[in-house]
Structure formats: structure tokens, C-alpha cells
UniProtKB/Swiss-Prot annotation:
Keywords: Heme, Iron, Metal-binding, Oxygen transport, Transport. It comes from the Eukaryota. Residues 2-142 form the Globin domain. O2 binds at H59. This is Hemoglobin subunit alpha-A. The keyword Cytoplasm does not apply.
Amino acid sequence: MVLSANDKTNVKNVFTKISGHAEDYGAEALERMFTTYPPTKTYFPHFDLHHGSAQIKAHGKKVVGALIEAVNHIDDMAGALSKLSDLHAQKLRVDPVNFKLLGQCFLVVVAIHHPSVLTPEVHASLDKFLCAVGNVLTAKYR
């Protein structure tokens, strides 16, 4: 999926607003994913999955940190996320569909906290970006 110049601008603008909330927004997206799609919990058997868990907050911060890294290298996401792609494909063996599920939950979190920012055009750009990140993370599965 190719991001247009306008998509890239939209995504960068969204992340300037949310980057200071990485831990909270990431944790909220994970909690939503675990609640809405319970089978995703199987990848976190060692985590305390309760609301407010330090483990979920820490992992949420990592998730949003990776998204920020992708934004910062939006023209070379594959290079920026290569090690993360290796980890998820070869060691963790996360089902690729889970990246899409988490992306949907992340969109909901952005919509809740920044409804005026998430216009239909920005929503489309952010969705394309999250799909592109998912594609990068699953590229090494093949």
C-alpha cells in the first residue's frame, strides 16, 4: 500500500498530537484488543492482563514507540522495522491478522482522544499507514 504525500502529512500530524501519550494510548489499544479479540491474549501468557497493568503499559509504550519509529522513517519503514519484523515472524510467530486487529483498536483510541483530528481523510491516511506497518511486520513470514 503506497502512502501519498498527503497521507504522510496526515499521519505525521496525528503523531505529533499523540506521541506524548505513547504508554497510555498503547495500553488502551492493547486492552481493547484483548477484550474485543480474546484469542489475542494467547501471545501474552506471562502478562498481567488486567486494566492498568504495568506490563500492558510497558508493552503499549513499545507498540506506539514502534509506530513513532515508522512515522519517523515513513519512506523506509521496512528498514526501520526490520528487527521487529524478524522478532515477530521468527521468534514470536504472531498470527499476522493480529496486526490488523491492533491497528483497528489503535484507530479507536485515536478517535476517542482526538475526535476533531480524525476527519474521514485523516482516518483513511492513518488506516493506510497502519496497514503498511502491518505489511512490513508480516513481510518476513513469507
